[in-house]
């Protein structure tokens, strides 16, 4: 069967292993999943309460336009409903954007170490992918600007960045946007927006009034704790959103997902508490790393990245202790959990790095 030639360059997305899959390899004991940046504390209790009380006619299609959810988002963000596009997670929103905008001969520009779906969908559409190395874990907007050309249709900026957790500040982002042609779409993926505590983090929505070529992406999968419902959204200029809706599949967000997201979006107290406990969890890891001279990136998300060698060894050590983290060629990414879970992972890290120091000393004395 003939398919696009470029599909041979790609692999299906491989999520982190589930606890059930881990048991097959590491034995039948409990596992804590800290690999995919889900909310370790779950979702708003209001969501669970309201869904139990609600009745949905499961024989009927959902509202194809997600009208109530989009209006709820628009009201809170002070934009028009027509500026909001909802998708089955940001994965689908990224696919919609790529399918609507890109064609063979175009290129996209993004970072070399960032969310891989930007690259994935560009290749599917037959586009060149220009990847710029991070600068100390942060998007290098100066370098990105220098490689943008007349064929660049999309610049993808993950802010805060996944997997490093770092961010581009307001001044740098605004300066970058001012220097990019309005013919190039700038997509700012703010999946971890709710976790941010930095004072100079950009407020991007006001930029939409001046720049028609900006799209801001956010999700209910992270801080809102609704990853299994698959709801993400884009906010942009009304004319652009209208065109993207042509590509969007009909009935792409289920009735249950729309209702859960609408309820969750109204519980500000829950988000405030989540940010508080998440910040405490980050401080646990940061304190440990500083005390033991272990490199880490200052995070504005619900995970921390340690740029260290032998990430696979750390993954194995954590797995044998019942913790699932995400290894990378140049480090490990660890989702913030409960205080007790963080302490458990830190204990494994402590033992791992002590063993490495001991081994280095022994080799030096040989």
From Swiss-Prot:
The modification N6-(pyridoxal phosphate)lysine is found at residue 222. One of its GO terms (molecular function) is histidinol-phosphate transaminase activity. It catalyses: L-histidinol phosphate + 2-oxoglutarate = 3-(imidazol-4-yl)-2-oxopropyl phosphate + L-glutamate. Its cofactor is pyridoxal 5'-phosphate. GO terms for biological process: L-histidine biosynthetic process. It is an enzyme of class 2 (transferase). Residues 1-21 are annotated as: Disordered. Gene3D superfamilies: Aspartate Aminotransferase, domain 1, Type I PLP-dependent aspartate aminotransferase-like (Major domain). It comes from Bacillus cereus (strain ZK / E33L). Keywords: Amino-acid biosynthesis, Aminotransferase, Histidine biosynthesis, Pyridoxal phosphate, Transferase. The keyword Transferase applies. Pathway: Amino-acid biosynthesis; L-histidine biosynthesis; L-histidine from 5-phospho-alpha-D-ribose 1-diphosphate: step 7/9. This is Histidinol-phosphate aminotransferase 2. Belongs to the class-II pyridoxal-phosphate-dependent aminotransferase family. Histidinol-phosphate aminotransferase subfamily. Its EC number is 2.6.1.9. The keyword Ribosomal protein does not apply. InterPro entries: Aminotrans_II_pyridoxalP_BS (IPR001917), Aminotransferase_I/II_large (IPR004839), HisP_aminotrans (IPR005861), HistidinolP_aminotransfase (IPR050106), PyrdxlP-dep_Trfase (IPR015424), PyrdxlP-dep_Trfase_major (IPR015421), PyrdxlP-dep_Trfase_small (IPR015422). Homodimer.
């Amino acid at each position: 069967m003939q398919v696009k030639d470029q599909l041979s360059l790609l692999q299906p997305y491989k999520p982190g292993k589930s606890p059930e899959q881990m048991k097959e390899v590491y034995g039948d004991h409990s596992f804590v999943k800290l690999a995919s940046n889900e909310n370790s504390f779950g979702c708003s209790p209001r969501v669970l309460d309201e869904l139990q009380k609600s009745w949905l006619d499961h024989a009927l299609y959902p509202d194809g336009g997600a009208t109530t959810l989009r209006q709820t988002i628009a009201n809170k963000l002070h934009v028009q409903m027509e500026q909001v596009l909802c998708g089955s997670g940001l994965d689908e929103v990224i696919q919609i954007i790529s399918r609507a905008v890109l064609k063979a001969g175009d290129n996209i520009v993004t970072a070399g170490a960032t969310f891989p779906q930007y690259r994935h969908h560009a290749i599917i559409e037959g586009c060149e992918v220009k990847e710029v190395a991070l600068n100390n874990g942060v998007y290098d907007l100066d370098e990105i600007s220098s490689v943008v050309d007349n064929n660049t249709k999309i610049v993808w900026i993950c802010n805060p960045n996944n997997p490093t957790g770092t961010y581009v500040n307001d001044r740098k982002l605004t300066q970058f946007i001012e220097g990019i042609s309005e013919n190039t779409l700038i997509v700012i993926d703010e999946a971890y927006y709710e976790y941010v505590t930095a004072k100079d983090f950009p407020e991007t929505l006001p930029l939409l009034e001046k720049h028609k070529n900006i799209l801001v992406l956010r999700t209910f999968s992270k801080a809102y704790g609704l990853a299994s419902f698959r709801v993400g959204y884009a906010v942009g200029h009304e004319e652009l959103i209208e065109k993207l809706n042509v590509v969007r599949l009909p009935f792409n967000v289920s009735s249950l997902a729309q209702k859960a997201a609408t309820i969750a979006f109204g519980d500000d107290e829950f988000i405030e508490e989540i940010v508080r406990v998440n910040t405490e969890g980050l401080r646990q890891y940061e304190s440990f790393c500083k005390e033991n001279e272990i490199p880490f990136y200052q995070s504005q998300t619900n995970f921390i990245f340690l740029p260290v060698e032998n990430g696979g060894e750390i993954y194995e050590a954590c797995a044998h202790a019942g913790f699932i983290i995400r290894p990378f060629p140049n480090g490990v990414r660890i989702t913030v959990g409960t205080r007790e879970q963080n302490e458990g992972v830190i204990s494994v890290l402590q033992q791992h790095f002590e063993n490495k120091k001991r081994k280095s000393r022994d080799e030096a004395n040989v």
